[in-house]
Amino acid sequence: LFHPEQLISGKEDAANNFARGHYTVGKEIVDLCLDRVRKLSDNCTGLQGFLVFNAVGGGTGSGLGSLLLERLSVDYGKKSKLGFTIYPSPQVSTAVVEPYNSVLSTHSLLEHTDVAVLLDNEAIYDICRRSLLDIERPTYTNLNRLVSQIISSLTTSLRFDGALNVDVTEFQTNLVPYPRIHFMLSSYAPVISAAKAYHEQLSVPEITNAVFEPSSMMAKCDPRHGKYMACCLMYRGDVVPKDVNAAVATIKTKRTVQFVDWCPTGFKCGINYQPPSVVPGGDLAKVQRAVCMISNNTAVAEVFSRIDHKFDLMYAKLAFVHWYVGEGMEEGEFSEAREDLAALEKDYEEVAAEGVDEPEGDDY
């Protein structure tokens, strides 16, 4: 599946330290990475863009991830970059300095990705436990299988034939109203185990309703607290446009799904005839049809404000900051990244409120 020449590994880890991943260890390995990317891109006839997967809680994902994105922007300026980023969860934490790493990393995600899909382990754990999968103690493999379904749905239209195919740049066009407002929520349905799939009726309206459920969101964030700006529904399998239109019409009448008033249509639908495939012996049932939703909702700001709050508590005491400065970072970078995120939260507030009264001074 992966050519061994394209697998790059390092000998040391970034010790949960953004500065180490970005400046110390990252600097040594990033040229090798870009060299391999260049070889691959030279073989492409029409390079469309990059999919970047990282987690921003640790040091390597945040530091090296940011560095790589920055360098890709330099080398391939116009190509689109889609990020799938795992953010720290509200309750489940893997490192003390997660808030620092996330804030520093989001600073470059803001500038160097065109669309970023936010994921968080806790939300996906809950989906595994609570949904029809009933996995008592989900492992990372279980989580990854769910995430991979979403990613697979996003790229199906590049790989197979369908009635309404959606290519990668189309996501950007339809989902991003302003360049900075590009952090997406994702959800997938049906998440159902093989044992239960036999007696469940999984019609198009049913799976469409399911992806709008707050409990289906792959990041801990309640879409009912915000408004939708746009959403992309990718159906795959046995689905016809008539059913999709009917299902979308029903969603539009629901009080719980609110759209911003400056975006009246808000839905982009794609249909692909290739039914979803599953890992043999995996948790998910083989189903006739499935849908994946990527949505731009103002409630995503909750994810950022949670991290910012934790960041502020530690930074007020300058706790752990010396580890970062010791690896060649400047203290000013902390406040710069934090201000950038504060501005982002403000951007989301304004977007949600626009139309009620026009904000003074146009930032865009």
From Swiss-Prot:
Q: What does UniProt list as catalytic? A: E170
- Keywords on record: Cytoplasm, Cytoskeleton, GTP-binding, Hydrolase, Microtubule, Nucleotide-binding
Q: Which InterPro entries match?
A: Alpha_tubulin, Tub_FtsZ_C, Tubulin, Tubulin/FtsZ-like_C, Tubulin/FtsZ_2-layer-sand-dom, Tubulin/FtsZ_GTPase_sf, Tubulin_C, Tubulin_CS
State one molecular function term (GO): hydrolase activity
Per the record, what is one GO cellular component? Answer: cytoplasm
The positions annotated as site (Involved in polymerization) read Y364
Asked whether the keyword Endoplasmic reticulum is assigned, the reply is no
- UniProt record, GO biological process: microtubule-based process
Cofactor(s) it depends on:
Mg(2+)
Which transformation does this protein catalyse, written as a reaction? GTP + H2O = GDP + phosphate + H(+)
Q: Where does GTP bind?
A: G59, T60, T94, N121, N144
EC code(s) of this entry: 3.6.5.-
| Residues in the signal sequence | none
- Kindly report the protein's main subcellular placement as a broad class: cytoplasm
Q: Where in the cell is it found?
A: Cytoplasm, Cytoskeleton
Describe its function.
Tubulin is the major constituent of microtubules, a cylinder consisting of laterally associated linear protofilaments composed of alpha- and beta-tubulin heterodimers. Microtubules grow by the addition of GTP-tubulin dimers to the microtubule end, where a stabilizing cap forms. Below the cap, tubulin dimers are in GDP-bound state, owing to GTPase activity of alpha-tubulin.
Give the quaternary structure: Dimer of alpha and beta chains. A typical microtubule is a hollow water-filled tube with an outer diameter of 25 nm and an inner diameter of 15 nM. Alpha-beta heterodimers associate head-to-tail to form protofilaments running lengthwise along the microtubule wall with the beta-tubulin subunit facing the microtubule plus end conferring a structural polarity. Microtubules usually have 13 protofilaments but different protofilament numbers can be found in some organisms and specialized cells.
For this protein, the record's PANTHER family field holds: TUBULIN (PTHR11588)
Protein name according to UniProt: Tubulin alpha-2 chain
Organism the protein comes from? Anemia phyllitidis
The gene behind this protein is: TUBA2
